[in-house]
Curated annotation (Swiss-Prot):
Residues 891-901 have a biased composition (Basic residues). It is an enzyme of class 7 (translocase). Zn(2+) binds at residues 885, 887, 896-897. InterPro entries: Helicase_ATP-bd (IPR014001), Helicase_C-like (IPR001650), P-loop_NTPase (IPR027417), SEC_C_motif (IPR004027), SecA (IPR000185), SecA_CS (IPR020937), SecA_DEAD (IPR011115), SecA_motor_DEAD (IPR014018). The keyword rRNA-binding does not apply. PROSITE patterns: SECA (PS01312), SECA_MOTOR_DEAD (PS51196). It comes from Klebsiella pneumoniae (strain 342). The gene is secA. The lineage of its organism: Bacteria, Pseudomonadati, Pseudomonadota, Gammaproteobacteria, Enterobacterales. One of its GO terms (biological process) is intracellular protein transmembrane transport. This is Protein translocase subunit SecA.
Amino acid sequence: MLIKMLTKVFGSRNDRTLRRMRKVVNIINGMEPAMEKLSDDELKAKTAEFRARLEKGEVLENLIPEAFAVVREASKRVFGMRHFDVQLLGGMVLNDRCIAEMRTGEGKTLTATLPAYLNALTGKGVHVVTVNDYLAQRDAENNRPLFEFLGMSVGINMSGLPAPAKREAYAADITYGTNNEYGFDYLRDNMAFSPEERVQRKLHYALVDEVDSILIDEARTPLIISGPAEDSSEMYRKVNKIIPHLIRQEKEDSDTFTGEGHFSVDEKARQVNLTERGLVLIEELLVQEGIMEEGESLYSPTNIMLMHHVTAALRAHALFTRDVDYIVKDGEVIIVDEHTGRTMQGRRWSDGLHQAVEAKEGVEIQNENQTLASITFQNYFRLYEKLAGMTGTADTEAFEFSSIYKLDTVVVPTNRPMIRKDMADLVYMTEAEKIQAIIEDIKTRTAAGQPVLVGTISIEKSEVVSRELTKAGIKHNVLNAKFHASEADIVAQAGYPAAVTIATNMAGRGTDIMLGGSWQAEVAALENPTAEQIEKIKADWQVRHDAVLAAGGLHIIGTERHESRRIDNQLRGRAGRQGDAGSSRFYLSMEDALMRIFASDRVSGMMRKLGMKPGEAIEHPWVTKAIANAQRKVESRNFDIRKQLLEYDDVANDQRRAIYTQRNELLDVSDVSETINSIREDVFKATIDAHIPPQSLEEMWDIEGLQERLKNDFDLELPIKEWLDKEPELHEETLRERILQSAVETYQRKEEVVGAEMMRHFEKGVMLQTLDSLWKEHLAAMDYLRQGIHLRGYAQKDPKQEYKRESFSMFAAMLESLKYEVISTLSKVQVRMPEEVEAMEQQRREEAERLAQMQQLSHQSDDEAAAEDLAAQTGERKVGRNDPCPCGSGKKYKQCHGRLS
């Protein structure tokens, strides 16, 4: 109550921010007459003037009024479009490192030109980030004439562009591209083998369109560049045959309940758990199929990979549904984005899940991949000096933007008042009753000439509604991932009188639905339209537009509540743009996923008390409130998952930054011999210490072991035993110096054969390659550690602290391995002639390029299955990385359980 009173007196933080910015808008408006008097050349010259002022030390913020006035005037001359005052406000919000919430149809694309121009004046580059290539290309081409008029260059960063074209795109003042491509380029730059191979500049200012989609919906999706791992497709096929024999039971076994089934599914956590009966049956079936030896347990360390296959297959069958989570097209399993309903070509689930789904669907199983480099969007976008974003729906996620990205959200008012009617939800007992009610509503609306947009949450649901509409004889268009190509055409004509369009979630985001249809699309369909034809099309459109407005504007029907209120608001936001009339309503049933998982018992009880009859709907504030609470529960759960993911990724991020900084320093120098000499001293000291403990008695020295180690690991045959026999007075210090000196002399003799320049080149290559190889193995080991770390909670330890502690030890061990392997490789190298070395170098580069091409955006599950706890017992012999694994698999230790330790 007190907060409400204070807000009334002083205004909210949002009101105060807008009040401050409106003063600047008045200054910009005051400059308009002076700008109108300038000639084109004088207006263009302003860019050079601003840049000169910045070079002399003027602050960018001081240029806002003048720079915005220049862009507004240029837009009037180039496009015939004048920025509204609210768009100027939006531009200032975006320059202030904030999120601007601007409703659909308020002209976000034009608003973005203001801060993009202002920040490009610094010459450090501006990255405009969109959700797909189509929008990046569209926005870049639409705004190019304006920026080029003002003397700014525009680049488009598309996937598949060759490196020189990418470098050119990044060198432009303003670059348009997708979030994936910017992230991948960052990772690829950090896998480059020469400074010339890098394409990005320093990350300066990112302006993110549909910021909620990229920074929140995509936050759990790490970008992963991967290379091929071992082929285990046959194992996926074998395990897949076993799963149909298992029976699902409703809940997990406990002290009070023992079911008859073999596995239970936790829909909320998206986990599958085997019961005792299930484990026994699985083991029997695996033995029958000859996959596992009789008498073995699925949980024994030797079967850890088999357990991984079983878990992946179970999840593929129990949690992932065709036409909801993925579609099968041209013999390929393609993921469907749960937030937008779009297909995500080229993305694959990780942890063998994608292969398990391929086995389930009987399509070709593609090889598993090994991570070479990865980063989450959360950590990538936090690398920018300055970050801002815009969307139609950010207010519900304001807390997350603030706590994770340190970005405040400012709600920018609409240019015209919003008059859309949002009606209360209608709740039915069954799905069938709900669908019937939707059909009746559509009939009523279309009879009056009102266009209808039906939003569904999956392809499967959109096809159910489509079938019912076909039965009822209602003509309609379906917009889902299967009909991706015709998306823009369908959206353009969704505002026709009595048009019915079914859309999965919000496929088609970024394109406005014009009431009466799009006259621009009709003009574009003609080859060489005459002025008369264009006038006639416009006149016809005006008649249709007025008819649709009179009928009540676009009507939105939601067939189900989404987990997030934000996605529901996006659907509603398709109607009522720019002050147009419109209406919206959600139809729900007790069989909907959200209601079943989160709100079923309370709401079902409420509905029974109110005496529900079949076909009857309930429309009550209590029910709407219960649903909103359910959504809040899911949102806060998802926020916790994302926050936890970030806390864990922050540990990896610190290590990533250290490795990439080190790598870039290596790339930028041509001579690393000083580093090599320093490392050699450390490595030889540690090697000798292992066999001759410092300040120890001669009886404790293991001379034979030292000789063998020097020969095997450093190709150095030294008669140490003879030296000691011949020279009884040989001290430990002198012996150490002699061994190191011998190593240095042997290395120098090799250098004399190939020449210093070639040796420096080779040293750098070995360091980079070894660093990449060990970093790749370290990423896999961190993955395993992350998956099983939650089990430490049972020992009353904080999993996050344990993860930090262990990952730091692993990182330190990796750096020691790096030193050792670099010196070992350089010592053992066979000297060849310069031409041969150059040929091998070329071959290595080609291999590196091939791996970099095999990029893959992986969907990391939020609920990674826990790995077996294989903590090494203290006191056991330390196994060498290249020794056979003690588990008996026949693999090298580093490729088997060494990845887990």
